[in-house]
Amino acid sequence: YGQHCDNTWIMGGKPFANTRADLSFTLFLANPDEYSGGELSIFDGRNSTDIKLQAGKMVIYDSGSLHQVKEVTEGTRICCVGWVQSWIANPQMRTLLTDMDLQIGRLKKLDNIPRSEFDELHRIYNDLLRQNMR
């Protein structure tokens, strides 16, 4: 497939009618040594990253990212692709909330964080989540 971004809306039958595509995924079903070429190339605005994973591995990326599948020159590339609607529509807020959640998880493992400080950070995270869920 040539370079493109995925459509914003997935039009399908119930229960998926008018589903917003926030995240795209590619599940690799063939091992990299079974075909030549066929890399999923994702462009982040400055650089392209080529991805070709083992069978059973999945990559998830923003549906608005420019991406393409490079030409398969030998063998057969077998993948399952799909789209996910996030509770958080704004991609920047989705990234911020994910980063915050990961950091809270790291802090939770430390012994020297007062419980009251951790609880306040967790409250702020959940308030942001509530404000941005759709």
Set out the residue ranges of the language-model regions.
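Catalytic core of non-heme Fe(II) oxygenases with the double-stranded beta-helix
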Residues: Y1-C80, V84-T98
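Long, contiguous binding/interaction regions
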Residues: A55-V59, I78, E120-R123, L128-L129, ...
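Charged/polar low-complexity intrinsically disordered segments, enriched in acidic residues
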Residues: I88-I124, L128
